[in-house]
Amino acid sequence: MLSKKENLLKLDWIKTNGLIPAIIQDFASNLVLMHGYMNKEAFLKTQKEGFVTFYSRTKKRLWTKGEESGNLLKVIDIVTDCDYDTILIIVEPLGKTCHLNRKSCFFLKENTLNFLSKLEDLIEDRKNFNTDNSYTARLYKSGTKRIAQKVGEEAIETILAAMKNDGDELINESSDLIYHLIVLLHDQNLNFNLIIENLKKRKTEKL
């Protein structure tokens, strides 16, 4: 789970008065999710259990992010900065990180990956929507076979648009294809982050 273990052993707890700042970042989108503080006990608990635990300076106790809401932060990796007084924790967020029901506690300008993440959240939320008001909800209700069929149909339409050298139509059909693919992934309890992570693991020199 951890990288650069030798560097983590060098964390300067004395310099930081026993509290190390911890920056939390989404492993797939690189979105900065939140910031907190850890004492040595919180840090060791995070390492041992694999979920982010902070030290609350106001309540004077440890608290695991998401211990009440269920929106835990699953640890993927932990690295330290060059001064050994700050750590960066790469996580897989299991739900919304911010208490305002947002992906991030920071008000960041939307970029492409942030938009994709928001789109996924919307598509996932539609599982429980009234089918009268949502095309996505109706898709979910129609079942996996129908959703997979729609992905196939949109793939064919994307190919046909490319064969016609129609750029605008290709963009539109590609958008439909990606949308339906995301619905299919969520129907199978998967998400696009897993696709991104899988692509990261592939040897780019062979692409």
Curated annotation (Swiss-Prot):
<comment type="similarity">
    <text>In the C-terminal section; belongs to the PRA-PH family.</text>
</comment>
<dbReference type="GO" id="GO:0004636">
    <property type="term" value="F:phosphoribosyl-ATP diphosphatase activity"/>
</dbReference>
<comment type="pathway">
    <text>Amino-acid biosynthesis; L-histidine biosynthesis; L-histidine from 5-phospho-alpha-D-ribose 1-diphosphate: step 3/9.</text>
</comment>
<keyword id="KW-0067">ATP-binding</keyword>
<feature type="region of interest" description="Phosphoribosyl-AMP cyclohydrolase">
    <location>
        <begin position="1"/>
        <end position="115"/>
    </location>
</feature>
<keyword id="KW-0378">Hydrolase</keyword>
<dbReference type="InterPro" id="IPR038019">
    <property type="entry name" value="PRib_AMP_CycHydrolase_sf"/>
</dbReference>
<comment type="pathway">
    <text>Amino-acid biosynthesis; L-histidine biosynthesis; L-histidine from 5-phospho-alpha-D-ribose 1-diphosphate: step 2/9.</text>
</comment>
<dbReference type="InterPro" id="IPR008179">
    <property type="entry name" value="HisE"/>
</dbReference>
<feature type="region of interest" description="Phosphoribosyl-ATP pyrophosphohydrolase">
    <location>
        <begin position="116"/>
        <end position="207"/>
    </location>
</feature>
<dbReference type="Pfam" id="PF01503">
    <property type="entry name" value="PRA-PH"/>
</dbReference>
<protein>
    <recommendedName>
        <fullName>Histidine biosynthesis bifunctional protein HisIE</fullName>
        <ecNumber>3.5.4.19</ecNumber>
        <ecNumber>3.6.1.31</ecNumber>
    </recommendedName>
</protein>
<dbReference type="GO" id="GO:0005737">
    <property type="term" value="C:cytoplasm"/>
</dbReference>
<keyword id="KW-0368">Histidine biosynthesis</keyword>
<dbReference type="GO" id="GO:0000105">
    <property type="term" value="P:L-histidine biosynthetic process"/>
</dbReference>
<dbReference type="GO" id="GO:0005524">
    <property type="term" value="F:ATP binding"/>
</dbReference>
<dbReference type="Pfam" id="PF01502">
    <property type="entry name" value="PRA-CH"/>
</dbReference>
<keyword id="KW-0028">Amino-acid biosynthesis</keyword>
<keyword id="KW-0511">Multifunctional enzyme</keyword>
<keyword id="KW-0547">Nucleotide-binding</keyword>
<comment type="similarity">
    <text>In the N-terminal section; belongs to the PRA-CH family.</text>
</comment>
<dbReference type="GO" id="GO:0004635">
    <property type="term" value="F:phosphoribosyl-AMP cyclohydrolase activity"/>
</dbReference>
<dbReference type="InterPro" id="IPR021130">
    <property type="entry name" value="PRib-ATP_PPHydrolase-like"/>
</dbReference>
<keyword id="KW-0963">Cytoplasm</keyword>
<dbReference type="InterPro" id="IPR002496">
    <property type="entry name" value="PRib_AMP_CycHydrolase_dom"/>
</dbReference>
<dbReference type="InterPro" id="IPR023019">
    <property type="entry name" value="His_synth_HisIE"/>
</dbReference>
